[in-house]
Each structure stands twice: as structure tokens, then as C-alpha cells.
From Swiss-Prot:
It comes from the Eukaryota. Residues 1-39, 88-99, 159-183 are cytoplasmic. It is a multi-pass membrane protein. The keyword Membrane applies. Signal peptide: none annotated. The keyword Protein transport applies. This is Protein jagunal homolog 1-A. GO terms for biological process: defense response to fungus; endoplasmic reticulum organization; granulocyte colony-stimulating factor signaling pathway; neutrophil differentiation; neutrophil mediated immunity; neutrophil migration; protein transport; vesicle-mediated transport.
């Protein structure tokens, strides 16, 4: 909007911001952490779909076992890793601290623990593959050990970041609760 003083009205150059109210930092932290957790949950869901598809295709004999290998033992408990994400999603709308704590603990049990067990389960096979070049399980022509280790590296990062942002969100909610109690 043009004014008589020039192209910009006086007082709209951003110099008058100091007196304005600002959003409290714990609200900013809460909003940004919720956003990151939602993005990570989408990535986790995509990883979960890949694992569930491999388990389903293998058990329903939709394709030959030469094309898609039988699942490793760690993949079955990992299918429960969707539960912590669901509980975390329930915690978000009303800032429910107890649901978020349950989500964080169950993420360790149902998401991270199966991945650690899987790394230990597949280590001898990975060692054999890299020492002797022999693989006995394949997923679409690729070594199943290599494919699953790649998936596990991505999954462990996703779950670690989910737990990290959940902790930041929990801290923001506790700060908000403490400030309300002080008033």
C-alpha cells in the first residue's frame, strides 16, 4: 500500500517489533517436535510396510522363496513397532504426557530391541557373505542380509530420532505444565 511518505507506510519496516508479544519457547518447541515426530512416523510406516510385505508375501507363498526369502526371526516382533507410533499419535492432540511416555518406552521394546536382535541374528550370515561371498537368502536377486541390514540402518535412525524428538516434546510439555502451576 502506498502512502504520502513513500512506498512504505511509516512504522511497517519491522523496527517496531520489540513491544509485540512472542510465542513462548516451549510452545514453539512443542509445535516443531510434533511436526518432526509426524514426519518420522510416516517414514516408519513405510519401513513397516516393507517388512510386513516381505513377511506376508513369504508366508502366503505369493512368489517363490528364491525371489523373496523367508523372514528372519526379528521381523515378527518388529511388526509390533506400529503400536508405539499409534500411541504417540494419540498423545499429540491433547499433549498427553502419560501416552507419550508409554510410546517412548514401547518404542524401545518393540522397535529398537527387535532391530538389535536382528543385527545379532544376521551377523554370522553377513560375516559369511563378506568373507566368502556366499549368500543363501535373496530378495529380488539381492542378498537378503545386505537388504535387511540397509533397512535396519535406516530404521534404527528413524526410531532414534523419534525417541529424541519425543524426549524434547516431553520436556516442552513439562515446562509448560510447570509454568502453569507457578501462576
Amino acid at each position: 500500500m502506498a502512502s504520502r511518505a513513500g512506498p512504505r507506510a511509516a512504522g511497517t519496516d519491522g523496527g517496531d517489533f520489540k513491544h509485540r508479544e512472542k510465542v513462548a519457547s516451549h510452545y514453539q518447541m512443542s509445535a516443531s517436535s510434533k511436526s518432526e515426530i509426524k514426519k518420522l512416523t510416516v517414514v516408519h510406516f513405510l519401513i513397516w510396510i516393507l517388512v510386513a510385505a516381505q513377511v506376508a508375501v513369504s508366508h502366503l507363498n505369493l512368489v517363490s522363496h528364491d525371489l523373496v526369502a523367508m523372514p528372519y526371526q526379528w521381523e515378527y516382533p518388529y511388526l509390533l513397532s506400529l503400536v508405539p507410533s499409534f500411541i504417540g499419535a494419540l498423545a499429540m492432540p491433547k499433549n498427553n504426557i502419560s501416552y507419550l511416555v508409554i510410546s517412548m518406552i514401547s518404542a524401545g521394546l518393540f522397535s529398537v530391541a527387535p532391530l538389535i536382535f536382528g543385527a545379532m541374528e544376521m551377523f554370522p550370515l553377513a560375516q559369511q557373505l563378506y568373507r566368502h561371498g556366499k549368500a543363501y537368502r535373496f530378495i529380488f536377486g539381492f542378498s537378503a542380509v545386505s537388504v535387511m541390514y540397509l533397512l535396519m540402518v535406516i530404521a534404527i535412525q528413524v526410531h532414534a530420532w523419534q525417541i529424541y524428538y519425543s524426549k524434547k516434546l516431553l520436556d516442552a510439555w513439562f515446562n509448560s505444565t510447570l509454568e502453569k502451576k507457578k501462576k
